[in-house]
C-alpha cells in the first residue's frame, strides 16, 4: 500500500507551529543567531564570545545552544529541514539577524582548509528554499548583505 502525505490547504491552519517553541527564545531576548552544523564550528564561535550564560539544551530542535546577551549560538541537526525549522522557531521568538556557518569542499586550489568563504550565489536543486523565495534556479544575495566584508 502506498501512503501519501496530506498537504495543508491555504484555508487550513498549519500543523507545525514554531511559536510553540519560541518562548525560550523570547525569554533570553535574542536579536541575533549564529547557526552551525558542526561541533567544531559551534565550539569556535562559543569560545569567541566574551561571556556566555551557560550551555543549555533547549527544546528548539537543535543539538545545543549557548546564549550571550542578545546573541545565541546554535548547533543545528544537519540538513535543510532541521535548520529551517530551527530558524523558524528563532524568527517566531523575535530573532532578526542570522549567520549560518556550514562546511563544504572546494574545487579551487587557492581556497585552503579553514578559509572563510562567503557565497554570493547558489544553484537550487532541492531542500526547503522553495518554500521561502520565488522559484528560480539560481539565487543571489543582496549586495548590502556583504558590504564591508
Locations of the language-model features?
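Metabolite-binding pocket within alpha/beta catalytic cores that recognizes anionic/polar moieties
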Residues: 1-148
Amino acid at each position: 500500500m502506498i501512503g501519501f502525505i496530506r498537504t495543508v490547504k491555504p484555508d487550513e491552519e498549519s500543523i507545525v507551529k514554531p511559536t510553540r517553541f519560541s518562548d525560550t527564545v523570547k525569554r533570553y531576548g535574542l536579536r541575533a543567531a549564529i547557526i552551525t552544523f558542526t561541533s567544531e564550528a559551534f565550539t569556535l564561535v562559543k569560545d569567541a564570545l566574551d561571556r556566555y550564560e551557560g550551555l543549555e539544551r533547549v527544546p528548539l530542535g537543535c543539538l545545543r545552544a549557548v546564549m550571550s546577551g542578545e546573541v545565541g549560538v546554535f548547533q543545528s541537526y544537519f540538513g535543510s529541514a532541521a535548520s529551517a525549522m530551527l530558524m523558524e522557531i528563532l524568527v517566531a521568538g523575535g530573532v532578526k539577524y542570522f549567520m549560518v556557518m556550514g562546511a563544504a569542499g572546494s574545487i579551487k586550489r587557492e581556497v585552503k582548509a579553514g578559509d572563510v568563504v562567503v557565497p554570493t550565489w547558489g544553484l537550487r536543486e532541492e531542500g526547503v528554499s522553495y518554500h521561502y523565495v520565488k522559484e528560480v534556479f539560481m539565487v543571489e544575495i543582496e549586495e548590502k548583505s556583504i558590504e564591508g566584508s
